[in-house]
């Protein structure tokens, strides 16, 4: 595939895509903002602990590959970064809002079921029903310039198959592990996680507002 990202590059791109939609007032992001987003404990799998130098290296590489661009001047005291991975003026990759939400959530959390994706992507795009989630996944799997996602074999005890993005290469289906937890439990967990993410974002916005008022 034309688009190939390392694990850390996928995390950086996913974070910028997420923040562009969920916290536009804080976007583009500084290096520190990207570090914080990459190391979030909510809506991240796996949880990472990247250093500023590690993140800066990824940012530099992605700028060279034209997946990001720097923004400076016009009142910005520090260099900030915005994504050019998709939907940029001169880029080839064009995605709908629904597709961006699913791709972002897959970049940030890895393989997930349609039910998990619907709950976890809700802050970026509100799917009307599960049929819309599944049809969007199928579109991503069958695009002429793709495929961008793949459906994995259903695990024993699971009602839904998981999907994974293909921006980091082909995916090997992991060995099936017998797990009798049902889809309802998975959906409940996903809803709880979505609420935790919303609380964390609200706290971040409050801290930013208080810091601004203190200036």
Curated annotation (Swiss-Prot):
InterPro entries: DUF480, WH-like_DNA-bd_sf, WH_DNA-bd_sf. The modification N6-acetyllysine is found at residue 80. Keywords: Acetylation. Belongs to the UPF0502 family. This is UPF0502 protein YceH. It comes from Escherichia coli O81 (strain ED1a). The gene is yceH.
């Amino acid at each position: 595939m034309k688009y190939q990202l390392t694990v850390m590059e996928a995390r950086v791109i996913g974070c910028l895509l997420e923040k562009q939609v969920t916290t536009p007032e804080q976007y583009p992001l500084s290096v520190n903002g990207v570090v914080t987003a990459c190391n979030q404990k909510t809506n991240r799998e796996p949880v990472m602990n990247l250093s500023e130098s590690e993140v800066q290296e990824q940012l530099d590489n992605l700028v060279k590959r034209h997946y990001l661009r720097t923004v400076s001047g016009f009142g910005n005291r520090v260099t900030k970064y915005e994504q050019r991975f998709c939907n940029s003026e001169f880029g080839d990759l064009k995605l709908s809002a629904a597709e961006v939400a699913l791709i972002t959530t897959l970049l940030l959390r890895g393989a997930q079921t349609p039910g998990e994706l619907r709950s976890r992507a809700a802050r970026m795009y509100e799917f009307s029903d599960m049929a819309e989630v599944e049809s969007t996944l199928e579109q991503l799997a069958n695009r002429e310039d793709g495929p961008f996602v793949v459906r994995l074999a259903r695990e024993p005890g699971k009602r839904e198959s998981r999907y994974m993005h293909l921006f980091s290469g082909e995916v090997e289906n992991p060995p099936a592990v017998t797990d009798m937890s049902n889809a309802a439990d998975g959906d409940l967990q996903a809803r709880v996680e979505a609420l935790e993410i919303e609380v964390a974002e609200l706290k971040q916005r409050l801290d930013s507002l208080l810091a601004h008022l203190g200036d």
